[in-house]
């Protein structure tokens, strides 16, 4: 994909920054965000998707709309239900309505979560699932092209320091106890932000129009083994403590690719491993 005008809403954030860094090489990138991005050679507009005048103008000028702006902290989401629905679901509806009235054909790219495949529900996954259903319904009705990518647990460059790897590395670096909810057997599929960015570039390049794709890496670990791996690599004296036998009601588990329908997944080979990332984090 080359020479496309792409609007990235929330492009200064963790995943948005990584994707912007890849896409800017061959395209014209505009980032709409509250904070200035840490990357150069992109156009920055301060604001959010509730700035109606700005968003109208930017959507009209761009061909592809990528929406990363959302509440992604699960604990915050569970405590702020209304705000989460407003920012994660209502905003998507408003963006689609603005795309609908444009004369030129647009495409929307929406990052969702592979943990929608799990049995447990919380306000974060509910907001993502609701957004997916709204996108599929409205895009079909208004003939708007879309791609929905269900993303795994992401770590790496531009990290927001709220993911499980960052939390465990910080504890282990200070030889503090690493706390685990439940048995620690809950599995996660992990993917580096640069690998995610390259995979999203691939999804935008190839014919994935009007599809929901589960993006997976070749790195799946349970939480207990992740903690042990981090302690070993860092050579930490940290002890691993299980807080209780029962896991949190809203905890996710990625048990198997078998839960994901054939033909709707993309397995991406990791160039940036967890081990390599842990070593880099301890040096920084």
Q: Locations of the language-model features?
A:
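Rossmann-fold cofactor-recognition segment
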Residues: 38-51
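Conserved Rossmann-fold NAD(P)-dependent oxidoreductase catalytic core, especially the SDR/UDP-sugar
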Residues: 67, 90-124
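NAD(P)H-binding glycine-rich loop region in Rossmannoid oxidoreductase-like domains
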Residues: 49-86
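C-terminal substrate-binding subdomain of Rossmann-fold SDR/epimerase-dehydratase oxidoreductases
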Residues: 172-284
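N-terminal Rossmann NAD(P)H-binding glycine-rich loop of SDR-like oxidoreductase domains
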Residues: 6-25
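Conserved beta-loop-beta element that borders a ligand/cofactor-binding pocket
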Residues: 112-113, 133-157
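SDR active-site strand-loop-helix element
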Residues: 9, 32, 65-69, 108-114, ...
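Active-site helix of classical SDR
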Residues: 127-130
């Amino acid at each position: 994909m080359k020479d496309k005008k792409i609007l990235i809403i929330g492009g200064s954030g963790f995943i948005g920054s990584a994707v912007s860094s890849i896409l800017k090489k061959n395209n014209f990138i505009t980032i709409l965000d509250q904070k200035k991005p840490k990357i150069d050679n992109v156009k920055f507009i301060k604001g959010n998707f509730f700035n109606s005048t700005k968003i109208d103008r930017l959507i009209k000028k761009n061909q592809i709309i990528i929406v990363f702006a959302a509440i992604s902290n699960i604990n915050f989401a569970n405590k702020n239900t209304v705000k989460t629905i407003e920012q994660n679901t209502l905003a998507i509806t408003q963006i689609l309505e603005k795309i609908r009235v444009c004369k030129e054909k647009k495409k929307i790219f929406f990052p969702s979560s592979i943990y929608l495949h799990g049995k447990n529900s919380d306000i974060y996954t509910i907001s993502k699932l609701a957004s997916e259903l709204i996108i599929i319904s409205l895009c079909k009705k208004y003939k708007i092209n879309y791609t929905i990518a269900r993303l795994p647990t992401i770590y790496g460059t531009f990290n927001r320091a709220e993911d499980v790897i960052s939390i465990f590395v910080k504890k282990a670096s200070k030889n503090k106890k690493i706390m685990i909810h439940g048995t620690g057997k809950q599995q996660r599929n992990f993917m580096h932000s640069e690998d995610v960015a390259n995979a999203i570039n691939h999804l935008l390049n190839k014919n994935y129009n009007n599809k929901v794709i589960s993006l997976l890496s070749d790195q799946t670990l349970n939480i207990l083994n992740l903690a042990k791996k981090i302690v070993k690599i860092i050579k930490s004296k940290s002890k691993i403590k299980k807080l209780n036998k029962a896991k949190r009601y809203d905890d996710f588990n990625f048990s198997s690719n078998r839960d994901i329908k054939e033909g709707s997944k993309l397995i991406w080979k990791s160039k940036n491993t967890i081990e390599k990332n842990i070593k880099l984090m301890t040096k920084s």
